[in-house]
Design a protein with these regions (language model features):
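Positively charged, solvent-exposed patches that mediate nucleic-acid binding
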Residues: 1-123
């Protein structure tokens, strides 16, 4: 059975040290819209951190749209992901992309992460 499709606080990266650890020792994946840095964790599930800058995403409306899209994709696919900390950074092309393009791009990145570290099976 799939777990609940929520995004509780324990599934979020918040501390600067968590972001720094991911950037220093994590594996990078990317495409035209996003860069993902992933590092295994001992938390028992994936955690998400966002880095959506004014430089790459423009106005607050666009930044928040991109953030919502990332969080929603993570929420829907978190039970298929391995136990890793993920830092997702938006690239400049994400600003003008349609929501469907962003969702497809994120799905491809989640699959790359899962190929690197297979998700534990939920029997």
């Amino acid at each position: 059975m799939r777990g609940r499709l929520t995004h509780p606080a324990q599934r979020r990266l918040r501390r600067k040290s968590d972001f720094e650890a991911a950037y220093a020792r994590g594996r990078r994946f990317g495409n035209g819209f996003f860069a993902v840095t992933a590092i295994p964790n001992d938390i028992g599930g994936p955690r998400l951190g966002l880095a959506v800058s004014v430089k790459n995403a423009g106005s607050s409306v666009e930044r928040n749209r991109i953030r919502r899209t990332i969080r929603e994709s993570f929420r829907l696919h978190q039970h298929e992901l391995p136990h890793v900390d993920l830092v997702v950074s938006a690239r400049g092309r994400a600003r003008d992309a349609a929501g469907s393009e962003l969702r497809a791009s994120l799905l491809a990145l989640w699959q790359k992460v899962t190929e690197q570290w297979p998700a534990p099976s939920h029997s």
